[in-house]
């Protein structure tokens, strides 16, 4: 695997800055960059925490980096509503604090996470600042991206080669830019992407759409559980 220039610049920035913010849409290599950053820090004996809002996102970090990530609530030792054992009076003991899916974190939880970090700890936050805002008040990650300059912020724009093959990612990014991904003549089934992983089904009435949706769902349950 070879990193492109913007990815290398992002990795270097994250290893040399006290605060580093990484933003980019799906398929621009955030996970690969995260893997390199975690590897560099851990191999050089830095202590590190890796956190995400959801358990699924934390699991993805662990799978991608082999580094044990946790939810923010578990990292902070949540014992009740907005009650954490790791806090401004009892900081987390770590050289580097990494937060993934930063755009999903609301202002209240972000404040608790930030207060639990020591002044000498390096901070790395990754996410997509153009995603839907988090549940709860505040859109902290997006505000941070707009507030800091490119000495702190890395904006990834170049899609990785594998992402360019995915119909799901290509079409999602078109929709994100308010561009209709379907340009061909409508037919019952349209497949997009070199990987053929994105398909559309069209029917002439609501009942047919309902039937195909139920059938597809049941088939997925049968195959994937």
Segments the model singles out, each with a brief description of its role:
Residues 1-12, 16:
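Pre-P-loop entry segment of helicase/translocase ATPase cores
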Residues 10-13, 130-225:
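Conserved helicase motor core of P-loop NTPases
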Residues 20-23:
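Short hydrophobic/aromatic beta-strand immediately N-terminal to the Walker A/P-loop
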Residues 27:
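Walker A (P-loop) phosphate-binding loop of P-loop NTPases
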Residues 30:
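Conserved lysine of the Walker
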Residues 33, 37:
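Hydrophobic positions on the alpha1 helix immediately C-terminal to the Walker A/P-loop
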Residues 46-116, 155-159, 168-182, 195:
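Conserved P-loop NTPase motor core of helicases/translocases
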Residues 99, 126-127:
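Hydrophobic residues in beta-strands of the RecA-like P-loop NTPase core, especially within AAA+ ATPase
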